[in-house]
């Protein structure tokens, strides 16, 4: 049976992640409070952010930029700033 969570991003009950994707307290928070649907939406934004800003995941500063954007997007209702991107209406 699928595990459900009250998703902080979607503000509704939804199927949760199958397992904790990120280690530590942040990973636990995501596992407990973010749905699979919201995580998939974040992954799309993350890919766009990495590509647009030419971030390198080996660089600690770039990983911090991604982590801050992820927390803002998933928990604080902040949109990811991606230059040149216009969302579909």
Curated annotation (Swiss-Prot):
Keywords, in A-Z order: Iron
Listed Pfam families: Iron_traffic (PF04362)
Keyword Translocase appears in the UniProt entry: no
Record-linked InterPro entries: Fe_traffick_prot_YggX, Fe_traffick_prot_YggX_sf
Transmembrane among keywords: no
Membership in a protein family: Belongs to the Fe(2+)-trafficking protein family.
Protein name: Probable Fe(2+)-trafficking protein
Species this protein is from: Psychromonas ingrahamii (strain DSM 17664 / CCUG 51855 / 37)
